[in-house]
Every structure is written in C-alpha cells, then in structure tokens.
Amino acid sequence: PFDDAGNIIFTRTWTDASEPKVDNQGNEIRPSQVEVYKWQSTFCKDDMGYIINPYQFYFEAGENTITMEGVNEPMVLKKLTLAAIDDSVTYEEYLANCPGEGNSETNINYVQVVQGEDSTIRSESSLYAKYDKSAPNTQPYSVTNTILNYVGGETWCSAGQWIEWEFSVPEDGYYNITVKGRQNYARGSVSSRTVYIDGEIPFEEMEEISFEYENDWNNLTLADADGNPYKIYLTEGTHTIRLEATLGGSGILLEELEDSIYRLNQIYRKLLVYTGATPDQYRDYNIDQVYPEVMEAM
C-alpha cells in the first residue's frame, strides 16, 4: 500500500544466560547473551523510527487479502490482528480513566529500586550490562573491582532499540517513576526514549522523554513541564517497563530531509544524463525548456 510497508522489522529478544560470575579477584564477569524464544505482539510500524505510532491501513468493507513476504531471517507467525485505531490520550484523559481512589500509606511510602544492569529482556545482544568506575553515585560501585552497574551507553543509540525491566508493587494505586541516566555522547543534543508500561504507552506524553547532555548521572523523574511527577496507575503484582530509543521530535524533520535528498538525487541523475559528467561551459542546455518539471521542483 505504501513504500514503508515493504520493510517491517520484527525484533528478536535477548537475555543473560546466567547470573554474573565473579573471578578470584572479585571482578564480575559479564554473562553471555542468549536468545529468548517467546511469542511477541507488535505493531507494524516505521523501522527507521521517524514515526512513533503504528502504521494505519485502509480496508474496504468485505473480504481483503494480506500477504507477507519473507525478506530476511526465519520467523514463526501465530496470528494477525486487525484493530480499530485508538487515539493516544493525554495525561489528563489518562487520569480521568483511572480509578479515583487515593493512595494508601503503603504505596505512598513504597520504593523499589531496579538496577539498570538487571534488565529482563532486550532487543539486541549488544545491550548487555557494563561497568562505570568513574562515578561514585552509581550502584553498586567499586574503585578497585569491575562491578556491572549500568546498561546501554553508546550501543543504545539507534531508533527502535529497547530494554525492558520487571518490577512489582504491593497494592493497587498511583506510583511515580524515576529514571537514573546519563547522556554524555551527543553534546548540544538530547537522547529520547519512549516509555512502555506493560507493553503499552500509557499516554502521549510518554511517547518521548528526553535526556539532555550531561557528564554526570542524574535522576529524571517522569513529570510534566511544571515538574509535577506523572502518576502511573498500577495494579498489585508484577509489571514491566520498557524504554525504547526514538528520534523524538526530530524524526519528522529527518524524514523530510531524507525525502528532499532523495528528490535532489533524482534531479541530479536526470541532468547528468542530459549534460554528461563534464558539462560544456560554452553551451546553453536550455534546461528550463527541456526539463521544465526539474526547474519547478528546484
């Protein structure tokens, strides 16, 4: 139906093969990565990350045909689901749809720290746990020994890469989420992540959270423009949180730039056929008459 639908990516999932081992010097040894064979539910969406929301397909009433052609690597397909388009909700609409009971003393005082290196699954085998000895505010920390204490870094830079963690809450209620991170790779720029709770983006403000350039580790509480922390409603039990790299607000600009470069290359090739690689400077090629559409496009 459109060009981008010709390249739909289905990511594999990876996890640690075992707990980190410790050598006789007290240094942790990073475990190898193994693929997790599990069913995944995923939308058909832009693999380049220019657009966060899933693709929308138009179907006529009655019987339609969907054909999927394998391009690279084997996979097993269990089912296809066609669903009505759900418009993303704002934070205010999200709160209005959640239960109105206030928090109890238990979940007001509840704190659970999930270390970054303890991620459950991830989209690529390169997103393994690493160590940082330069910052004493990392946990765990050791000056002398190699201790795995973070995940991501320079390998977590491409749109669509994600890391997922499990956590639990003691009872139903509203909870705040704080992410400890550091973005010291792109000076003058930001790194953006999309937040998924239990596989879904709870509200549109979670489509992009930004980490500005900073040499130090900082705590970023997910909050609105005024600094008020977002209240996330969770039921008692185990949940997942996934952070997925995204281009954020620059995605649309990059897509337009790529499209402009593509069209300029088309114009260049057309002119190259007409004038040759070394145009005669003493000849008038009358391009405006031969290729009026090129002049209009430029």
Predicted regions, residues:
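Extracytoplasmic
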Residues: 1-298
